[in-house]
Amino acid sequence: TLHQEDCFITPKSSSPPIAIVTGSNTGVGFETAQALAVRGYHVILACRSRQKGLDAVDKINQKISTVCGSEDISKVGKASFLQPLDLASFASIRSFCKTFSEKYDVLNILVNNAGINSQGDVTEDGLEICFQSNFVGHFLLTKLLVPSLMKAKNTYKSNKYKEEAGRIVNLSSVTHHFAPSNERTLS
């Protein structure tokens, strides 16, 4: 549970740290995005479903207002935003990264959380959908965002982290134990 003492209000004169959370419209991704937003991060929700992403943005921004004691999000100095991303499409990943780099210089945290549990379907890029969404897509996303993560040096207020680049957090699950192997779709 988040409380007002968890709220870190970023002064308007300084830029809040930037975080991207994939698969952030539900579950662990949503909770992660919400916790980062309440703690002062400008959070970009990278979601496949535009409507579900917008609903999550509204919930997070409402939580910020409630926890931080402000009805006007702009007074709090941070918010969450949606930027559509489909990890099953290399074109979507490239478009996401291009849009991000046009809007922002620095990325402080990348949380690779999105995942699907599907088998058999093949993406437009010719890979099995689960393999592309859960592994290859995150790898490409991370690779394309490394320049922005490297620019995070010297953006932290604490000298303890001053020389460190942005952080990459990769989440996984044990659901791979439940999926039967299908060698035909792995080629």
Question: Predicted regions span which residues?
Answer:
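Rossmann-fold NAD(P)H-dependent dehydrogenase/reductase core
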Residues: 2-187
